[in-house]
Amino acid sequence: MVEFAIVLPLLIVVVLGVVEVSYALMDQHVVTKLTREGSNLISRDTTLPDAATVLKSMSGRPVNFDTNSKLIFSVIRKGATSGTANFGQDILYQRLEYGALAASSVLSTKGGATFGPPDYQATNADSNTGLQLNGLPSGLVVGTGSMVYVTEVFTKHELITPFDKFGVKVPDVLYSIAYF
């Protein structure tokens, strides 16, 4: 009986850890699949608002764009108009952000950019140097005049066990990015 009392706290921590980590991995898998589907949609000439509507309609737990998630569509283009300020530069050509969670894209520009409806294209894409990206992941090369379609999804992960009370931290925001 004494041995059981000694081992029980450790056993509880292990069981709660397995349950919580499994739950977080399942949620991350859902976020990753949703992100890939978003990039797949926008790479096939679906408008950004239509793609956002599709992802909103197909999302379920843990993703709820009205309360605890954020979706960011970005289209990267290499400037192809010779003689312009953005010729040969990777620029943020289109962007649509949707959702209630306060999160920002890993793709940042050098300055201010405006992306208005209905197509959410950048204003003055050939001449606005503020659209130039600060850096792309190593190995990502955008051909001249080509585009790369990027989807990012952030969602808040809710714990289902008191696992964090034992000093073990599980991420509270899950994130996925897909480049097509």
Give the ranges of each region predicted by the language model.
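Intrinsically disordered, low-complexity regions enriched in Pro/Ser/Thr/Gly and acidic residues
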Residues: G79-D172
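Short, structured loop/turn "capping" segments at alpha-beta junctions
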Residues: F65-S69, G83-A85
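Soluble periplasmic/extracytoplasmic beta-strand elements of cell-envelope proteins
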Residues: K70-V75, V150-E152, I177
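Amphipathic, coiled-coil-like alpha-helical scaffolding segments used for oligomerization/assembly
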Residues: R61-V63
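Short secondary-structure subsegments characteristic of cysteine-rich extracellular domains
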Residues: V170-F180
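Alpha-helical assembly-interface signal, strongest on the long, hydrophobic N-terminal helix that forms
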Residues: M1-S59, S69-K78
